[in-house]
Curated annotation (Swiss-Prot):
Keywords: Activator, Developmental protein, Differentiation, DNA-binding, Homeobox, Neurogenesis, Nucleus, Sensory transduction, Transcription, Transcription regulation, Vision. Interacts (via the homeobox) with NRL (via the leucine-zipper domain). Interacts with PDC, RAX2, RORB and SCA7. Retina. InterPro entries: HD, Homeobox_CS, Homeodomain-like_sf, Otx_TF_C. This is Cone-rod homeobox protein. Residues 92-154, 236-257 are annotated as: Disordered. It is found in: Nucleus. It comes from Canis lupus familiaris (Dog).
Amino acid sequence: MMAYMNPGPHYSVNALALSGPSVDLMHQAVSYPSAPRKQRRERTTFTRSQLEELEALFAKTQYPDVYAREEVALKINLPESRVQVWFKNRRAKCRQQRQQQKEQPQPPGAQTKARPAKRKAGMSPRSSSDVCPDPLGISDSYSPPLLGPSGSPTTAVATVSIWSPASESPLPEAQRGGLVASGPPLTSTPYAMTYAPASAFCSSPSAYGSPSSYFSGLDPYLSPMVPQLGGPALSPLSGPSVGPSLAQSPTSLSGQSYGTYSPVDSLEFKDPTGTWKFTYNPMDPLDYKDQSAWKFQIL
């Protein structure tokens, strides 16, 4: 018990009376030796053959990869790090030379090349000396069609007709120039071609043969419709001839004039003209008050 109560060595407050081996070691460490200064690397001196190899690679590329640097380093017997530093210094020297050339004032007569003018927004980007021509041959400039002797553009107009092999009359000059239909619209008579007689489609002579080569057996039974619907009204796309021809023949729009019959029964008629002897008002075709006027032949 008494051993634990022995006081230790006395330490003064201002640490002037410190004693012991640990305290002595701490005081000895106060005087540290200075760190050794890094030795400067020796300056590399390149020979003429080494510079020729380095300049040849620098002419090819200013930023060689590690494989190219190692290959040159083996040729000139230098470490790859020296080759890398040489390229770094060579690029800096090249930039410095370019900067000095820009800062030097140029004489007045040295400016031979004029600065290209900026293109405006409305100017065409293509020029006569364009290196890349248009592969499709499409130019920006529009060439108008050639004018004929009458002053109208010579535009080829294809007249389309349905079931009409004969040559149609050419369109007027006003329609050929602007291609604008001067007659009534075609939609005003949508049922004009539906109820046209079959014999009227082959009434005009053509290369297909005689006029009665088609539907020759039905011509006597469809004969009342031929005078009302002329040849010019057969072509729905032939211009202004559609409107007047249909307006003059209101009976051509009535589909009830045919009645209901079969082609087999119609061939057995002895008197073809007697089957169509019914009278009615063209303006009121649906009002058949007097059925005695209907003179159909009973089979």
